[in-house]
Amino acid sequence: MRDLYLVDGYNVIFWVPDVFGRDDLESSRKKLIDLLQDYGAHNNIEMIVVFDGMGTSTKVKQEVLSDSFAIVFTPSRMTADSYIEKESYIRRNEYRSIYVVTSDGPEQSQVLGNGSYRVAVDDLMWSLKHDKKDQHTFIKKNNQTNRRSEIGHSLPPSVQEKLDKLRGKK
């Protein structure tokens, strides 16, 4: 059983405009989705990122990008907050833990009543930043240890000596 993160997408974008900007919502959404996909995959977390549909439809639009990542646009008369509150209640027995990412105070209070955990946007951003550092450290470490894998190092010492003699090293 794994964890589920329900993320209020626009709340995250507008909470940290220095990271996402406010001029182009499409590129801000794309950047947030990329960061969350990477974080979720690296930490085995299921993610649902919810955006207010703002008058676009009368039905929920869901785009499933993988078995552990989905994007939801709410219908015109439903806010991301109400969708997240409903989903956190409906899914409460399907996951080990449900985390709701928002810095909206009333929404945080509501989801706590459903048994979910709240994650402030600042805390999520800290986790994303440190997870990225951990990934870079892991990659750098593995690249250094695997940089050159010579077959000679895996040969028995007696064979290595004979090869060295043939090359004139001993």
Predicted regions and their residues:
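Nuclease catalytic cores that cleave nucleic-acid phosphodiester bonds
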Residues: 2-5, 11-170
